[in-house]
A protein has these predicted regions:
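Conserved helicase motor core of SF1/SF2 NTP-dependent helicases
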Residues: 1-306
């Protein structure tokens, strides 16, 4: 069983999956890959063109790019098989079609029950990226009333003036620090720097600026919270997440996204990771006029506003 399988490149798995015993037979009878191809893949230094595959024998088995995981390749192959079966229904008997479709679908499945996010926190990602299929387990923090708790909020910032680094935003750093204080005061003795609060932002310069703003508050516990990029946050969770977009110019919107497409639906894997780290509350700050140029971000802001 391989967990986080979408973070592992194919060559890193071949050694174990292709292992032979002393008798020369396959040592691995069956393997199960668990992962989420709608979140960030493994980090690869080469660009898509450099890692592309051109060998016909490899292309024939769905191996199109070395930056893709075995999980992604097998999933694509399975879904493509299902589509071929459905499109060729006129050429096969109902029994043949039913059996083939069943066999193809049985090759993969989706774990739909999630125990991390409160349903209101999960709402956008669930609708936009998972077709509304995510179901809360019903843990205490997922069923508690929202009457006195703000689950999802957006705090508008202003872009930095020309001449300032594009990778910092002072107004967002101040908003983040102010929110951090309020969250700390709300939790008091229950505040746990490794569990209560995390801050996500795309640039190292903005990370440093946010840390500086927080240090000026003179609250030791806040100095120990994790402030990092979305890539470093994948796989972790906090009760409350603050996301500073730090977009000062339109061209930065492209850097913020990691796009893929499935069944005609555009999926931003980077945004998906950022929005699914919070258990109880998710706070976002950014320049709304710029963010609304991206259709997904615009939909997110519209949901929050409603």
């Amino acid at each position: 069983i391989v967990d986080e399988a979408t973070q592992i490149l194919e060559p890193q798995l071949l050694g174990i999956l292709c292992a032979r015993g002393e008798d020369g037979k396959d040592a691995i009878d069956k393997f199960v890959l668990i992962g989420d191809h709608k979140q960030l893949p493994a980090v690869v230094q080469q660009n898509t063109e450099q890692s592309a595959i051109y060998d016909e024998s490899l292309l024939s088995i769905g191996l199109t790019n070395l930056k893709d995981s075995l999980f992604e390749r097998l999933y694509r192959n399975c879904t493509a098989t299902v589509q071929r079966i459905l499109s060729s229904s006129e050429q096969s008997s109902p029994l043949e079609q039913s059996y083939s479709s069943f066999a193809a679908h049985r090759s993969y499945d989706m774990l739909c029950r999630q125990g991390r996010m409160h349903p209101e926190v999960a709402l956008f990602a669930n609708r936009a990226f998972y077709g509304g299929r995510l179901i809360p387990v019903g843990l205490p923090h997922q069923i508690e009333s929202s009457d006195t708790i703000c689950r999802l909020a957006f705090y508008p910032s202003v872009p930095e003036k020309a001449g300032t680094s594009a990778k910092i935003n002072y107004s967002e750093a101040r908003i983040v620090a102010d929110l951090a204080v309020r969250i700390y005061e709300d939790h008091q003795a229950d505040f746990d720097e490794s569990r209560t609060l995390g801050i996500i932002t795309p640039y190292r310069s903005q990370i440093a600026l946010i840390k500086k703003e927080i240090e000026s508050l003179g609250i030791p516990a806040l100095n120990r919270i994790l402030v990092d990029t979305v890539e470093r946050f994948q796989g972790s969770e906090r009760d409350v997440i603050i996301y500073s977009f730090c977009v000062n110019y339109p061209y930065q919107l492209k850097f913020l996204s990691n796009l893929t497409e499935e069944e005609g639906v555009l999926i931003d894997r980077k945004l998906n990771v950022a929005l699914t780290r919070a258990r109880k509350q998710m706070f976002i700050t950014g320049v709304s006029e710029l963010l609304e140029r991206n259709p997904l971000y615009k939909s997110l802001l519209k949901l929050i506003e409603s």
